[in-house]
């Protein structure tokens, strides 16, 4: 960063990635009872986004989008039938994809992934095959284990593995301790790389169901166990930021906190809230793909600001590579753009468009404040899709809850968005699915 930013050199990068965290689950985003003092402070010292999007509304494609800067359909990490990787899956993030970790490692960064991976659990797809020097965590979701469900299919899964590098070091780890163990591993990595530029990716397992909190947090929130879980995540963020302060790395480290998608609404009190946004996980409504996001970099990102600029997890690859002085891949389409102008000035704007995919199909698109829906569903699973002919249209600045369809009043806006979508589809090349499980024919 230069000019308006004070740090010059190769910064460190930390991505803290919650799992199924709702847009309305943090104190700084308006939750009335969940206490998040560390995230609140992070926002007060940094930049809070009100319109930040993930690349998909479920786990696997969202993670692929974040690490590659590309829509998941371009890498084969999106599928209409099997929407995430399961223990029987044979695929994963292709070796040809370039991750943030690979690009930064190529210019001397130390790299670590600590937490839930969910981009392929066979050796050729693990973090160590995608640019990470170190890995500690579980390779897929914490509910994909016989101990979490009595379902017949789940009972065929192996015990949940906890891995270090490419080795399983435990089976069925105590999930009450996952957040704490990820935090401790993260702190160790940071302290081991005080003199090296580093990239730390911390994809937490929580608050994906089944939810667990450690003894120190269980029963401490008035929101119940879900609140306990979020307050422990907040503690974890505080621990990571504190070690950066203690080591003097805070002024040379760009930290971003966000989520893979918004809340799983059908699991009752075990899930969160999307606040004023409509619906949640698994859908292309705002409540599924707009996520709480805070950027922090003392003395470089101006403190205490809120931006309405559109941001995306896919922006992180070009942003971080640009800040580190690494070349962007020139042999492929990137869907993310550099967010540095917004980090410097919350009034700045970068690419103001969003494509909302469900699986490998485009269900909605946003241009500026306008969002057009072709198809909608009201839940992750269990309901039927609704076709919109003509497409439904919402003005998200005036109607962020997507309650008032104004398509009949805005035919020209529909035409403009359709032209944008047509151009997108014309250039898009979808890769073969990595997620399909042929033996699952039911």
Q: Positions of the model-derived regions?
A:
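Formylglycine-dependent sulfatase
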Residues: 1-392, 400-442
């Amino acid at each position: 960063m230069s000019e308006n930013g004070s740090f010059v050199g190769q910064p460190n990068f930390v991505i803290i990635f919650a799992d199924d965290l709702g847009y309305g689950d943090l104190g700084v985003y308006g939750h009335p009872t969940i206490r998040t003092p560390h995230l609140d402070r992070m926002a007060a010292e940094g930049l809070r986004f009100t319109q930040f999007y993930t690349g998909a509304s479920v786990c696997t494609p969202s993670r692929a989008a974040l690490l590659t800067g590309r829509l998941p359909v371009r890498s084969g990490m999106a599928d209409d039938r099997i929407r995430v990787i399961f223990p029987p899956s044979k695929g994963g993030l292709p070796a040809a994809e370039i991750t943030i970790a690979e690009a930064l490692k190529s210019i001397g960064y130390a790299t670590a992934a600590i937490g839930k991976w969910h981009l392929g659990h066979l050796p050729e797809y693990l973090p160590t095959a995608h640019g990470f020097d170190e890995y500690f965590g579980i390779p897929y979701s914490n509910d994909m284990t016989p101990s979490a469900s009595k379902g017949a299919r789940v009972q065929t899964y192996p015990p949940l593995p906890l891995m270090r590098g490419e080795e399983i070091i435990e089976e069925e780890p105590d999930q009450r301790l996952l957040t704490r163990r990820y935090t401790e591993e993260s702190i160790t990595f940071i302290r081991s790389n005080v003199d090296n530029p580093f990239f730390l990716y911390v994809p937490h397992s929580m608050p994906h169901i089944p939810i667990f909190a450690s003894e120190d947090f269980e029963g401490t929130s008035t929101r119940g166990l879900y609140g306990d879980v979020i307050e422990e995540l907040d503690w974890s963020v505080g621990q990571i930021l504190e070690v950066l302060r203690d080591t003097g790395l805070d002024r040379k480290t760009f930290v971003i906190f966000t989520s893979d998608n918004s809340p799983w609404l059908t699991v009752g009190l075990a899930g969160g809230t999307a606040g004023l946004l409509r619906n949640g996980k698994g859908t292309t409504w705002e409540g599924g793909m707009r996520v709480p996001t805070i950027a922090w970099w003392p003395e470089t990102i101006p403190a205490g600001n809120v931006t309405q600029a559109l941001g995306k997890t896919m922006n992180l690859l070009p942003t971080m590579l640009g800040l580190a002085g690494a070349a962007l891949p020139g042999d492929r389409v990137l869907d993310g753009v550099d967010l540095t102008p917004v980090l410097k000035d919350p009034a700045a704007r970068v690419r103001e468009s969003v494509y909302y995919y469900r699986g490998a199909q485009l269900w909605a698109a946003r241009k500026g404040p306008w969002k057009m829906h072709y198809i909608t569903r009201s839940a992750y699973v269990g309901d039927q899709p609704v076709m919109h002919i003509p497409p439904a249209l919402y003005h998200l600045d005036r109607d962020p809850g997507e309650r008032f369809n104004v398509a009949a009043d805005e035919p020209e806006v529909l035409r403009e968005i359709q032209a944008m979508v047509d151009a997108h589809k014309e250039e898009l090349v979808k890769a073969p699915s990595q997620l399909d499980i042929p033996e699952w024919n039911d």
